[in-house]
Amino acid sequence: VYPRISPVPTLSWAVRDLGCSGGVCVTASHNPAAYNGYKAYGPDGCQITSEAAAAISTAIEDTDIFSGVKSVDFDAALAKGDVTWIDDAVLERYYDAVLSKSVSNLSADEVAKAPLKLVYSPLNGTGLVPVTTVLERAGVTDITVVPEQRDPDGNFPTCPYPNPEIREAMQKGIELCERVHPDLLLATDPDADRVGVAVKDGEDYLLLTGNEMGVLLLDY
């Protein structure tokens, strides 16, 4: 169990890193807050298949919710060792793995000599700490975070549909860009497994599609 709110990718990583049978993340993802639910992951760290989901649904339907659901006192389970907290060493291994997969061959010091100026928004979700940590370790330190969307808030007060691939969710970030003039606007959805990118295009900002980002990365 993570002791704090954490993004989906860190859960997926921990399942494999710790050799778990599966993982569950409670999240509304990039959907409106009313759609809060959970994502389930298999032992490979990937989201479960439709076949596995169907089997789980059947098991739930066959369970008597009044007498068939097992429960345990959380503190007692911690004391017994049946439940354990995920420590920071797991996160450090995750950060190292992400940085090792960077498409850039530049060191952090080399990146810092040609600084990249970013505006970033976690869209009131979980991305702030891991995203800024990885960027800063990669040498990108000039990061301005959208203040209204900095802190976690499961009600998503600044945009009811926090999908960074749509302009409505990026609007606060675009407004900040017009004041601080960054090279790039980045935003992650609330559980930080989806990214949106916007770049200056004349007097406006252009949102890149996933296909466009993929082509740019491939070309680089």
Name these PLM-found stretches.
Residues 12, 132, 215-219:
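Short, hydrophobic alpha-helix immediately C-terminal to the catalytic nucleophile
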Residues 13-17, 126-133, 199, 206:
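Short glycine/threonine-rich loop-to-helix capping motif typified by GTGT followed
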Residues 36-176:
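Gly/Ser/Thr-enriched, mixed-charge loops and adjacent short helices
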Residues 2, 32-38, 45, 120, ...:
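Generic secondary-structure boundary/loop-capping signal
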Residues 8, 50-53, 211-215:
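Amphipathic alpha-helical transducer elements in NTP-driven molecular machines
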Residues 1-35, 137-197:
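N-terminal small/polar loop signature for handling phosphorylated ligands or for N-terminal nucleophile
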